[in-house]
Structures are given as structure tokens and as C-alpha cells.
């Protein structure tokens, strides 16, 4: 775990415990394997692991795919907090409704081609889609 800067096992466990609690990861204990967690808790465990390195940029590819609504909202809240704290959040999703809920700026990519950079000031689905079919 030295790759995360930990040489003190006690400090590491404390940090992991704090991240798991903050993300409301439902598990039997810190030694539980990620594969044994529900899909939503697995996603949150991945975020917890990323948080351990204190990144300045979060690259999220479909981070809420196949998770329940509560987990989805928790992930959105976490990423909003990180963005508000000055971190960059790149959020890739094919769910336009979700993008409109969470994004400040939207880069449209259609069939691998960059189409439009939009500032999300109450954009509608219809407005965004109009740029896709120009």
C-alpha cells in the first residue's frame, strides 16, 4: 500500500474506514472482498479507492450504470462536492437526462466526432439533440 503513501497500517485502516463511512458502503467489515458487495457498493468502493490518492482530476466512464437510485444520487453528490472543491470531473455517459442533471459544461461527441461544447444553463434534451443532428 506504499503506492498510496501508506507505511502505517493503522492510519491506512482509519482512512479506509472514513472513506467507506462517508460513502455509506454497506459491508460486513474492512476485510470484505469487493466482489462480495452489491453492484452499487462496488461502485462506491471504486470511488473510495480513487479518493485515497487525492486526485485533482476524476475521469468517470458511466459511473452510475447499473446502480440503484440512492447510489446514483450519492455518486452525483460526491462528484459535485469534488467539482465545487476545485477538482476537475470528466463525466462520460450515454444517459442525456443524467448529463443534464450533473454537468456544468457538455462536450457532445457523435460517432467519435466532437460536435459542440455547450454551457449547461437549463439546457433541454431537445436543444442538446438538435446539435447532434446538424
Annotate each predicted stretch with a short phrase.
Residues 1-134:
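Glycine-rich phosphate-binding loops of nucleotide-dependent enzymes
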